[in-house]
Regions:
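Conserved Rossmann-fold NAD(P)-dependent oxidoreductase catalytic core, especially the SDR/UDP-sugar
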Residues: 59, 98, 106, 110-156, ...
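Rossmann-fold NAD(P)-dependent oxidoreductase module
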Residues: 39, 43, 122, 160
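N-terminal Rossmann NAD(P)H-binding glycine-rich loop of SDR-like oxidoreductase domains
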Residues: 27-46
């Protein structure tokens, strides 16, 4: 399993190198009401190198902190309507996502590919010097030709994100992830799996 702390630590190291002439950074975050996004948010709030976090979501994450700002956007495909509020950010953690269970390819593509790539294009136009980090998933299919629908869609998403003119664009493919004890957006069944997966697959786990 991947630890959220581990992922954010890697990204912070990247920022340390890229932003070596600056003391602090401002980041945009999506998915703060989900498990991964909430974990990234908590880590950013605790990290001294992060000056400000703008959480863009369809609903509030219900967390109050001096470093945190919220922008509620009902439709990410209309993000350009909020362009004035997106200026001056150094990075974006795109952690929003949906499960493919019960979805046909058209609907899943709209929610996973169309929404993500449009969101990123808007940001690249406003902040071309930004680093864009996309939380994808293990077994994502970069060839876009495999039999697994969700893997093809995520592969196309990664490929097209990488074409955008950001300062840097990074795709993370975690498998099963552990969580912070402080997190609230964790399903009970996930807590059970999080406790046993490292023991069952120790060579494939990072804790």
């Amino acid at each position: 399993s991947w630890s959220i702390v581990y992922i954010v630590s890697i990204i912070i190291v990247i920022f340390d190198d890229i932003k070596k002439f600056f003391k602090m950074i401002k980041v945009i975050l999506t998915g703060a009401t989900g498990m991964v996004g909430e974990g990234v948010l908590l880590e950013c709030l605790q990290n001294d190198k992060v000056k400000e976090i703008l959480s863009i979501s369809r609903k509030s994450c219900n967390i109050s902190h001096p470093k945190l700002k919220e922008l509620l956007v009902s439709d990410f495909l209309k993000l350009e309507d909020y362009s004035a509020k997106l200026v001056g950010y150094d990075a974006c953690f795109y952690c929003a996502g949906v499960s493919s269970l019960g979805m046909d390819e058209e609907k899943y593509t709209k929610l996973t590919y169309d929404t993500t790539v449009h969101f990123a294009k808007v940001l690249s136009d406003i902040n071309p010097s930004m680093n864009f980090i996309y939380v994808s998933g293990t077994s994502t299919d970069s060839t876009e030709k495999g039999k697994v629908m969700w893997a093809r869609v995520k592969g196309k998403t990664e490929n097209d994100l990488h074409k955008l003119p950001f300062k840097g664009q990074y795709n993370f493919r975690p498998g099963f992830m552990s969580h912070f004890k402080e997190q609230k957006n964790i399903k009970f069944i996930f807590k059970i799996f999080a406790a046993i997966i490292p023991s069952l697959f120790p060579k494939s786990s990072l804790t």
